[in-house]
Amino acid sequence: MLSPRRTKYRKQHRGRLKGTATRGNRICFGRFALQALEPSWITSRQIEAGRRAMTRYARRGGKLWIRIFPDKSITMRPAETRMGSGKGAPEYWVAVVKPGRILYEMSGVSETVARSAMKIASYKMPIKTQFLVASKDSITV
């Protein structure tokens, strides 16, 4: 599963999910993409589950790009702990996703295969998503 090798600080504030994605909202690498339509935290386990589902469906063909990275640590307190005594220990990692963000990109497969693979991956996500096809002029390298 994805997680940072090291970070400057172990614990972060929760923050807010206001607005739409201004970066990472265009198809850059592949021909097909899965785009988020809602704001959410996506855990490293969910990202990995989506990746596995897509690679299994596409079999040998195709290349897959994961466009999000879980760089925010989420802390949790042990169960039945009294209030106070500081913030809990980092438990898992999430990627902060806003509407419009591209989650995955794919190329080297037909549109029907890509659409089906992305649909399976979308079931693993906690948000609504949409399937995108890059136009000829939109791909930048």
Swiss-Prot record:
Coarse class of the protein's main subcellular location: plastid
Subunit structure: Part of the 50S ribosomal subunit.
Alphabetized UniProt keyword annotations: Chloroplast, Plastid, Ribonucleoprotein, Ribosomal protein
Protein's cellular compartments: Plastid, Chloroplast
Family: Belongs to the universal ribosomal protein uL16 family.
Gene, per the UniProt record: rpl16
Positions of region (Disordered): 1-20
GO molecular function: rRNA binding; structural constituent of ribosome
Stretch forming the signal peptide: none
Name of the protein this chain belongs to: Large ribosomal subunit protein uL16c
Pfam families (UniProt xref): Ribosomal_L16
Organism: Staurastrum punctulatum (Green alga)
Origin: domain of life: Eukaryota
InterPro entries listed in its UniProt record: Ribosomal_uL16 (IPR047873), Ribosomal_uL16_bact-type (IPR000114), Ribosomal_uL16_CS (IPR020798), Ribosomal_uL16_dom (IPR016180), Ribosomal_uL16_sf (IPR036920)
Lineage: Eukaryota, Viridiplantae, Streptophyta, Zygnematophyceae, Zygnematophycidae
Biological process per Gene Ontology, one example term: mitochondrial translation
UniProt xrefs under PROSITE patterns: RIBOSOMAL_L16_1, RIBOSOMAL_L16_2
Gene Ontology terms: cellular component: chloroplast; mitochondrial large ribosomal subunit
Compositionally biased intervals (Basic residues): 1-17
